[in-house]
Amino acid sequence: VEAAGLTVDDFKDTTWSDFIEKAKKVVEKNNVPMLTSSGGSEIVIEMLQSAGASPMVDGKVDLVGNEALKKSIETYKQLIDEKIMVDYTDWDQYIASMNKGTAAGVIQGCWIMSSIQAAEEQSGNWAIVDMPKLDGIEGATNYANCGGASWAVSSNCKNTDLAFDFLKSTFGESVELYDDLLPNAGAIASYLPAAESEVYNEASDFYGGQTVYKDIVDFAGKVPGIDYGAYYSDIRSALTDAITNVVQNGADIDSEIKNAQDTVEFNINE
């Protein structure tokens, strides 16, 4: 970034069109892509969520006519076509692109941090900012998530009230627990009050003194909610096929979105 005459701040609170123009300078000066990616539809789904555009509305698939989805696929195609982003199918190559400096950045959930930090020699070279937002889409933001976890109480539980109370009083409200989990297990909470704790406010040497954990929790509180119903895997698989056809075969975006919707609806009705 610095080699291109830019700073980390130039990539904060930006739009995809602005990001792409700046990224071109980074690519030109460093001869590496600005972004590394893996999983095809993953970053498209992140873009979609950043605009709060649910792929399911009132229990029905809502891909056709979803302007945020179309804009996301168009943006993805531009990133690939202009060599601003490389998308790996091999996970090891994806991680290596970060560790070996053959990509300037990545848009991913905070769980990727442990893989980035495995390259200790890169300490001080990384920073964390919010993602670009989609241009011209109502409700677009600079925030999304990827991955996460769910807590559940089994129907076989003999004391569900106690189990629910345990989850509520620990993961649901204990800042002290999260303060212990962060340094000892590397688990980052999206529980908003955790951002006010001393542990979450500690600066990270690896990220140039940035209070990354506080920033991540702050970002998490701004992520729009979207609905996948029970069909996240079906939606993601269908979108991966659509994106592949658009990027590799020059297929029409609207037609591929229609095919994706038909595929998901077929799987739901099976």
Please place each PLM-identified region on the residue numbering:
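Solvent-exposed, amphipathic alpha-helical segments
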Residues: 3, 234, 238-249
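Generic structural signal for well-ordered, non-membrane alpha-helices
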Residues: 74, 78, 237-241, 262
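C-terminal lobe and pocket-closing loops
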Residues: 112-123, 134-238
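Hydrophobic aliphatic residues
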Residues: 48-51, 94, 170
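Histidine-centered catalytic/metal-binding microenvironments
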Residues: 255-256, 263, 267
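Helix-loop-helix "hinge/cap" segment bordering the ligand-binding cleft or interdomain interface
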Residues: 1-42, 54-90, 155-161, 165, ...
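Bilobed periplasmic-binding protein-like "clamshell/Venus-flytrap" ligand-binding domains
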Residues: 27-39, 173-184, 266-270
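Extracytoplasmic/periplasmic substrate-binding proteins
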Residues: 43-46, 70-165
